[in-house]
Amino acid sequence: MQMRGCVCHLGVYCVHNDWKNKQYRVPIYQCLFFNAETHSLHTFLVIGNEISENLLDKISISKEKIFMWDLNEQIMSITQKTESICELMFGNKQIIQKLSRTFIFLTIILNSNMYEIIDVCIDSNAVLYMPDLRPMIIRCVGNYSKISSELLSDSDCTQATKKMRFDYHVTNFCFSLNVNGKKVLFSSTESSESILEKLLEFFTIQTYKLAEEQFLMVTPKNFFTVLFDEDMCLLLLQTVVSFLYDNLFRNKLVVKQVHDYIGPDLWPQGHERAVYFVGFPNMWFLSIYDLDNKIPCIKNICNRILLYCGLPDSLGPDGCQSVPSTQCVDEFEDLPNLGALQYLKYNSLVVTMETVENSENVYYFFGEQDLFIVKLVDIIQSLLELYVPKSFLPDFSDAYIKSEILLKFISRLHKKSNNIFCKIVKKITEFLRCFLNACRLMDLNWMFIRNMHIVYFIGPKKDPSVVLPLLKTSVESCWKKILNSSRTPVVNINYIPGYNFLHSSCSFLTSGDINSEDSHWTITASKCLYNCLGASQITVDFKNIYTNFQQMVSVFLSHRYENKYWIEYFEPNNYFLETHEGLLDCNRYTAVWTTENKLIRQSVGYPLTDKIDFIHYIQVVIEIFKKWLLTKYSQQEYAETVRLGSKIISDHLHLFNVN
């Protein structure tokens, strides 16, 4: 029998030993398939080829072995495990490789038992097919075992790794499952009978017979993705899923599905916040920012999955599929590496760089030249469309698809689709080099390149009505020269006259943001600094400076209860983070500054913590202004500014009611 539709998820059911027929270590896969004719989901089995004992051992590496005291051993163990899982998913028989392509319209051939896939047919001009199904949303709360903060004090790895070394666990919990408005509550104290009865609201549970064995198939009803909030503890998520697994398979005379987990908490220095369950449950899990206020549509959900280009990011570069090119791509002798896609490039002839111990490097520039910020809106998208088949790419009309996300997608091509990766990087590099050279002829020097598509230029004061058209013309001519393309890139240019600055550390402040309408403390601070610099070019106008800081503090005060105004993203293990419950620091996280230059986790959906140190943010702006002052004035003005900074803080300290 044939069935038309698309694969929504492909996973492993188990690695089976058929003792009777002497077939050992045979992986049996489970495919969640959407029938386009009946608009329904089905689970089918696929029998793979025998795998080696060595591969199975690596796939089966336990958490206990991963969380070793030696960090190098931990990295080696999780690397071996993830690489082996990827080999299992992409390196087995051809039918498995075909089924690993999600959301592609295809035809599956079933055998006579109607639940085993024996062949797959994909059209040569494969097209995307996104089934219109709503996601499941999971929300959890729970309590954790106690752990001494003294055990979490050193900075060699994330708090998550330190906690798991000491058997940190969830003691009790409650959670809810919600699909399209149907919400059911669960508790860790409930009986298996109650749990199973509730799960039947969301899943179809059937028993299949294959190779003289019984297999329990758990198929979601009209959803293939589980969404959880970006601030949910990953240990809590793992505990809840394991709880459901135990209740589903307890006392069942069936071959148990494997059940394992890969996520950022397994890596000692953290990783991307992407989780993958090996075996049960056979669905996607996606972490969503501010899920309480905005549930993504099906197009956005499918786009996020397509951007994995295979398995979630936490499985590393081996989790990316091999992508064919739409054009003939040459072999490269001089191979660019991942460093070529660095998200921040700076011109050392213009920008000063300071190395800061146990923190991110600081880059800064102060000058009296005009500032031009050229945003090359769609060059990365255009290159992907040029070299990558459309069926591997997301829908670019989705506002979620930003250039920095596409850069991550390109970086994932590095290992298995290296020729495409090299071609794209080579073209971006050649285009930027051509464009920067053209701008140099206009007396414009580049300072920063952010995310390979935003370029900051400085130059002598000229008529912007002359410079702006020349910049656009330069982009178009360089693009045509390098790509030989008639397509005109979309370009946005921001012009800031006068006295400009840029300061990049853990926060990014720049005069380029003075026209921004976004509500964030860095925008307010940038506007204050721009006004202070402009008012102090001949002599330091301390009265004017005080007034500008006073206005900044007034805006700070008006936003003092808005957590989105204060929170920033921080990379795992880069800063000292106060002790917190759960595993919340193993991936990029939101936080605010507290006293003694420490961070405290701040969830988007929770009220702003009363431990925030508002004065820290004022001091950051004062320190940047003092740094500028040293480049232009004497120690006398600097000393006066130090006194002024102290006065600004003392005059406004009580207004924030700092504890």
UniProtKB/Swiss-Prot annotation:
Keywords: DNA replication, Host nucleus. It comes from the Viruses. InterPro entries: HSV_HEPA. Transmembrane segments: none annotated. The keyword DNA-binding does not apply. GO terms for cellular component: host cell nucleus. It is found in: Host nucleus. GO terms for biological process: DNA replication; viral genome replication. Belongs to the herpesviridae HEPA family. Associates with the primase and the helicase to form the helicase-primase complex. Interacts with the origin-binding protein. Interacts with the polymerase catalytic subunit. HAMAP family: HSV_HEPA. Component of the helicase/primase complex. Unwinds the DNA at the replication forks and generates single-stranded DNA for both leading and lagging strand synthesis. The primase synthesizes short RNA primers on the lagging strand that the polymerase presumably elongates using dNTPs. The primase-associated factor has no known catalytic activity in the complex and may serve to facilitate the formation of the replisome by directly interacting with the origin-binding protein and the polymerase. This is DNA helicase/primase complex-associated protein. It comes from Human herpesvirus 7 (strain JI) (HHV-7). The gene is U74.
